[in-house]
Swiss-Prot record:
This is Pathogenesis-related protein PRB1-2. Residues 34-152 form the SCP domain. The keyword Disulfide bond applies. It comes from the Eukaryota. Belongs to the CRISP family. The modification Pyrrolidone carboxylic acid is found at Q25. GO terms for biological process: defense response. The keyword Signal applies. GO terms for cellular component: extracellular region.
């Protein structure tokens, strides 16, 4: 009688460990650290984690779980979104690094993106006035991939203003 109980307990412990491992690479610090590294590189102060923004991000990510559409929430905060195809275990760092990699297409002098390029995700990451972030990640249903969103307060990308 003890053997089945032990097997069940062992299985539950392993499942909990796997969940914790997955969450360990998508923790608040896994979002905050690469944001702050990019900000530090251009002399901008750090952002901190906001549970309010995290709740907003999670609510919106949950709305995208069935379609995984790369579509903005239209909410009151600054926002970066990321989609990763099914079959890969996309993490917080993958999303933030994809946004930061737009730096090469941003011209600070003219405050513009290179022709035909996108750089607004990067400028939101380093927006000096944005001091709080909250992010969320969902694995979309029906093998549609991974959706990650980060929200920023105050919002950045104000037309006519430079990020730093």
């Amino acid at each position: 009688m003890q053997t089945p109980k032990l097997a069940i307990l062992l299985a539950l412990a392993m499942a909990a460990a796997m969940v914790n491992l997955s969450q360990a690479q998508n923790s608040p610090q896994d979002y905050v650290s690469p944001h702050n590294a990019a900000r530090s590189a251009v002399g901008v102060g750090a952002v901190s984690w906001s549970t309010k923004l995290q709740a907003f991000a999670q609510n919106y990510a949950n709305q995208r779980i069935n379609d995984c559409k790369l579509q903005h929430s239209g909410g009151p905060y600054g926002e970066n979104i990321f989609w990763g195809s099914a079959g890969a275990d996309w993490k917080a760092a993958d999303a933030v690094n994809s946004w930061v990699n737009e730096k090469k297409d941003y011209n600070y002098g003219s405050n513009t993106c290179a022709a035909g390029k996108v750089c607004g995700h990067y400028t939101q990451v380093v927006w000096r006035a944005s001091t709080s972030i909250g992010c969320a990640r969902v694995v979309c249903n029906n093998n549609r991939g991974v959706f990650i969103t980060c929200n920023y307060e105050p919002r950045g990308n104000i037309v006519g203003q430079k990020p730093y």
